[in-house]
A protein has these predicted regions:
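A short, structure-level motif marking secondary-structure boundaries and short turns
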Residues: 21-23, 51-53, 97
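A short acidic, amphipathic alpha-helical/loop segment
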Residues: 36, 63-66
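Active-site segments of SGNH/GDSL-like serine hydrolases
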Residues: 35-59
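Secreted/periplasmic serine-hydrolase-like ester/acetyl group-modifying domain
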Residues: 1-44
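C-terminal regions of proteins
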Residues: 65-125
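Weak global preference for isoleucine
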Residues: 5-7, 47, 58-59, 111, ...
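Serine/threonine-rich low-complexity intrinsically disordered regions
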Residues: 7-9, 14, 60, 90, ...
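Acidic-and-aromatic substrate-binding clefts and catalytic sites of carbohydrate-active enzymes
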Residues: 24-30, 54-63
Length: 125
């Protein structure tokens, strides 16, 4: 079976929030191909949105800087739910620090869908 498999509540209480440090070096080859992929999508008329899904962790501000910078340079939207208090304040939404459980996935899907609707169909269109 492939695709999403729901995970019920956390198997055990989650520890405190984990701290992730940003990488000191970005892989320039990977970044080049992400940029090429974005450019190809834009040439075809696609709406490109970068998304960082929720994790039960704390990150420093530089963690997503390369992605945020690329989004800014290309005029794209970057939806960063990783450090979003809606999720980091709710350990009951997580199966483990990197995976939402079914309750968290449902809540994230509601929020993400609403945000995506605003991007794809701005008011007045």
């Amino acid at each position: 079976m492939s695709g999403y498999i729901p995970i019920s509540g956390a198997d055990e209480p989650l520890p405190g929030l984990e701290k992730y440090e940003s990488q000191t070096q970005v892989d320039s080859t990977k970044l080049h191909y992400v940029e090429k992929f974005v450019d190809d999508c834009l040439q075809c008329g696609a709406i490109v949105v970068f998304v960082a899904s929720p994790h039960y962790s704390i990150i420093d501000s530089a963690y997503y800087a390369p992605l945020a910078d690329l989004a800014r340079r290309r005029g794209l939207t970057f939806l960063n739910y990783h450090g979003n208090g809606l999720f980091t304040d709710r350990p009951e939404y997580f199966h483990d620090p990197t995976h939402l459980n079914s309750r968290g996935a449902e809540r994230f899907s509601e929020i993400f869908a609403a945000d995506l609707r605003r991007i794809v169909s701005p008011a007045g269109e």
